[in-house]
Amino acid sequence: MSGKGAPELSVRNCGDLRVAVIAAQWHEKVMDGLVDGALRALHELGIDEPTLLRVPGSFELPVVAKVLAGRGYDAIVALGVVIRGGTPHFDFVCQGVTQGLTQVSVDTGVPVGFGVLTCDTEEQALDRAGIEGSHEDKGHEAVTAAVATAATLRSVSEPWR
């Protein structure tokens, strides 16, 4: 499983961060698990009023992330699922989403947690969705990474915190 070697992140003083979660709608069962994991992580971090927005698919995540980054959010979490099919569509969507979300983060300075599953099968996606029987919870992990990065950025600009 890919979770080997994952860091234990300690995040403090983040309850006042403005966080948005953007979730694609394809593969409903997987997405429900990712969203639940993300919202649970936010609650554990003391962020009880995040913005949750839905988009049709993963390819639409970057444009919404870009708009939100310009609206004062401290961190954005992008959740989606792309499952390989029999055409190159999978490769194009995965590359576009990954590059788009990276560009948003680098261009705006707003961390974007990458919770987009790129899997060969639905079973692989379910195993990472944070639902009962899953081995990983990528929604939770994406929130933790985004909020930890936002806290790091805040410590650089506000070292007295």
Swiss-Prot record:
5-amino-6-(D-ribitylamino)uracil binds at residues 26, 58-60, 81-83, 114. The active site is at 89 (proton donor). Pfam families: DMRL_synthase. Gene3D superfamilies: Lumazine/riboflavin synthase. It is an enzyme of class 2 (transferase). Its EC number is 2.5.1.78. Keywords: Riboflavin biosynthesis, Transferase. GO terms for biological process: riboflavin biosynthetic process. It comes from the Bacteria. One of its GO terms (molecular function) is 6,7-dimethyl-8-ribityllumazine synthase activity. Pathway: Cofactor biosynthesis; riboflavin biosynthesis; riboflavin from 2-hydroxy-3-oxobutyl phosphate and 5-amino-6-(D-ribitylamino)uracil: step 1/2. (2S)-2-hydroxy-3-oxobutyl phosphate binds at residues 86-87, 128. Belongs to the DMRL synthase family. Catalyzes the formation of 6,7-dimethyl-8-ribityllumazine by condensation of 5-amino-6-(D-ribitylamino)uracil with 3,4-dihydroxy-2-butanone 4-phosphate. This is the penultimate step in the biosynthesis of riboflavin. This is 6,7-dimethyl-8-ribityllumazine synthase. The lineage of its organism: Bacteria, Bacillati, Actinomycetota, Actinomycetes, Kitasatosporales.
